[in-house]
Swiss-Prot record:
SUPFAM superfamilies found in the cross-reference section: Acetyl-CoA synthetase-like
Name listed for the protein in its UniProt record: Acyl-coenzyme A synthetase ACSM2, mitochondrial
Residues bound to CoA: Q139, S470, G471, Y472, R502, K533, Y541, P542, R543
Main location: mitochondrion
Taxonomic source organism: Mus musculus (Mouse)
Protein role: Catalyzes the activation of fatty acids by CoA to produce an acyl-CoA, the first step in fatty acid metabolism. Capable of activating medium-chain fatty acids (e.g. butyric (C4) to decanoic (C10) acids), and certain carboxylate-containing xenobiotics, e.g. benzoate.
EC number: 6.2.1.2, 6.2.1.25
Cofactor: Mg(2+); Mn(2+)
Amino acid sequence: MHHLWKIPRLFTLWGNEISCRTFHMNIKKLIPIQWGHQEAPAKFNFASDVIDHWASVEKAGKRSSGPALWWMNGSGKEIKWSFRELSEASKQTANVLSGACGLHRGDRVAVVLPRIPEWWLMILGCMRTGLVFMPGTIQMRSSDILYRLQASKARAIVAGDEVAQEVDAVAPDCSFLKIKLLVSENSREGWLNFKALLKEASTIHQCVETESRESAAIYFTSGTSGPPKMAEHSHCSLGIKAKMDAASWTGLSTSDIIWTISDTAWIMNILGAFLEPWVLGACIFVHLLPKFDSQTVLKVLSSYPINTLVGAPIIYRMLLQQDLSSYKFPHLHSCFSGGETLLPETLENWKAKTGLEIREIYGQTETGLICRVSRTMKVKPGYLGTAFAHYDVQVIDEQGNVLPPGKEGDIAIRVKPIWPIGMFSGYVDNPKKTQDNIRGDFWLMGDRGIKDPEGYFHFIGRSDDIINSSGYRIGPSEVENALMEHPAVSETAVISSPDPSRGEVVKAFVVLAPEFLSHDRDQLTKVLQEHVKSVTAPYKYPRKVEFVLDLPKTVTGKIERAKLRAKEWKTSGRA
């Protein structure tokens, strides 16, 4: 598929003078090419054009003395790296990958590591050598790893003790896999030891001059149906888009510290804990957090000079379960949330107990961030904010026509005739799947929504999750939001359920809070139904309620409504 590319307001991206707030390309080594009607660099590499730039700024004494990466493990160990130290260590990593590992430009490398400093080194090392990194979660089991290695034809995998045994169980079935690189203090048969090799590696490395549109990363999307798809991103769609986005939502300066709590396999991690802070010269804070612990997070926020917090809504909900009056956050001034629906109740409670707003960010693996509520924008409960300037985001109908404000439709990004910077390159080996997601001139986000007169987008629900009952279209998140306001509900998922008279009715799967487990279920069902009727339009109330111990989720924590829905309709004989 051929697409035209654009970078609006190119002059804002680079110039001739060093500034502590703006990264600048080395113009002499970049050859402008025409993408549509805009100029863009023919070559771009985040490691050399951003990290090495800030290392030079530090050397010139024009950046504050704060770290670029501040890591801790909760057991007293802390690591602080400046951009100069980060630059040198990532060059050593690049030498390990191209030297001892014998990997070549374009080879694909699975990186399955927890939140340890080596993850950041490995991604930068891959960038420097022109390798394609593929992040994966340490929650994967052998079957997950096997699928990813086989589908991607990965030449190498980088992993720790957490998954090494799982890798060894499937490696013989992966004919393309040649290198297993272990990040551990221990040794393991058949594996190279990264830490040992790093100590001996040179700090001198010539960064590969990667093409802007050259493949940089592959993310396996956590779809709720079918095998994961391989979403491919270029050096341009990751790095240059980060520069275009960062200042317009985080507002970070070189003296700021941002903490993004995310699994290393998620797109949010590379955006909020790698690309976007570093293009602005800010510090990234990382806590190992092998298991999420609300008290640990609150203590860190109270004790460390963290200015900006980014996390999924569930993180804020879990923090709110603690007594926040015992904590003070003297440095925290900005909170952002993305990845799932932010309940108005969560936003209101957080504001009441901390005095801070939670601002939504919205996007997907394929697009990166497309909407946000920036620090200078007003917060509207239930709204995702407005589109970034370089994305034309609209609500469209089933024919691909743009709908006026206030009309419900599919949230989509215009990709024709200009395929915008930041959009992924496509699904690897699956151009049909890429094309199937385009309606008219627009890329479908897979979400239903409404755009208001001010340009704010209101999320209604996933396109395939919408419930149509007696002619009423009901978004599951609206019902879930209502249920979550009741103290009996710890977690919930709402789907459609077959009904002989209405076609479909709303059904809620509910995980009860511990203190309500002994309550009469029939009575509790009635209480919850009446509660929903009291806080939202009565036609939305769940006519069916099923109490469960847990909900099916993907490895990245998303509730699999599709799995619940398939089981529900199959049981009825109407699947």
